[in-house]
């Protein structure tokens, strides 16, 4: 698609978007408040308090046991920390020790140093470590003299697609008039810009290793927005939020069992189903989350609606 000059886009259908919408409806019903997710403050300490507590069940992308343990160790205090975590918490970076290195540098346990002081503006936000594809592109421009277009087509794309051999085996024509491999252009450009061969080689070697887990910042930033929004909703409206999470899994008994257990672990009471109190869906009350009739195994939405209709017609 890209070779044809057309824009390629991925549209994700995320359950989380439905959960957020339902949670907002629950909050509106119980408190009369219209929540606008775009106005949720990302500097709210309650977001990071929730993450640090490990009570992240139902929070987008950060509810697995491994991720929960990592967040508790990391102790994020800013949105940018969450963005980096989303990019790093994958098999490649975990195996390479990048996660622990980032956390140690972030918390002052290791020196946060870049390869060269002139690259601090590029690597400063990630404490001297390469985390995003965009950072590799910027280094190729700043240190090696690549044009922005060359940094995308001749560094980012081969790295993202793990076509590492192309970087050292294919001679290309460059905008400065030279004909050489990407590796040679990288090294020659760095030396021309007064970087040492040792620094240029070290970064190149790290870029090749980085290729196994390179992630783009825009993707991480988008996902991190949902992390922040769902964490904020759970922190401030736990009953309404977890009712939305449980409702989203209606018909999936194993998931309901998991999240009921998680609610109780997090101190959120789950009230038993009641023919006189329960709705079709899980509902949020002052006391906790009321089990929805449709969430009972073997009942289903149709039967639940019939029970409620009879209750409304004939009374409790």
Regions found by a protein language model. Give the residues of each.
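Noncatalytic, beta-rich nucleic-acid-contacting surfaces in large DNA/RNA-processing enzymes
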Residues: 1-316
């Amino acid at each position: 698609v890209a070779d044809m000059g057309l824009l390629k886009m991925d549209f994700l259908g995320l359950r989380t978007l439905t959960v957020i919408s339902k949670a907002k409806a629950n909050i509106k019903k119980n408190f009369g408040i219209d929540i606008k997710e775009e106005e949720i403050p990302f500097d709210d300490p309650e977001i990071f308090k929730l993450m640090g507590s490990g009570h992240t069940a139902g929070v987008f992308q950060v509810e697995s046991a491994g991720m929960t343990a990592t967040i508790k160790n990391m102790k994020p205090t800013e949105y940018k920390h969450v963005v980096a975590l989303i990019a790093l918490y994958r098999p490649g970076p975990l195996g390479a020790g990048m996660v622990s290195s980032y956390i140690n540098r972030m918390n002052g346990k290791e020196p946060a140093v870049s390869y060269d002081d002139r690259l601090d503006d590029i690597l400063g936000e990630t404490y001297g470590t390469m985390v995003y594809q965009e950072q590799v592109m910027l280094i190729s421009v700043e240190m090696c003299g690549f044009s922005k277009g060359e940094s995308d087509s001749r560094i980012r794309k081969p790295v993202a697609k793990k076509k590492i051999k192309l970087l050292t085996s294919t001679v290309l024509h460059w905008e400065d008039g030279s004909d050489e491999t990407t590796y040679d252009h990288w090294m020659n450009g760095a030396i021309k810009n007064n970087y040492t061969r040792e620094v240029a080689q070290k970064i190149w070697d790290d870029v090749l290793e980085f290729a196994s887990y390179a992630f783009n910042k825009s993707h991480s930033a988008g996902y991190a927005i949902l992390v922040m929004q769902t964490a904020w909703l759970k922190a401030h409206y736990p009953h309404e939020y977890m009712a939305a999470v449980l409702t989203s899994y209606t018909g999936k008994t194993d998931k309901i069992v998991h999240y009921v257990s998680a609610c109780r672990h997090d101190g959120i009471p789950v009230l038993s189903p009641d023919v006189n109190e329960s709705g079709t869906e899980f509902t949020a009350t002052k006391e906790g989350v009321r089990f929805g009739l449709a969430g009972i195994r073997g009942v289903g939405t149709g039967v639940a609606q019939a029970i409620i209709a009879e209750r409304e017609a004939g009374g409790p």
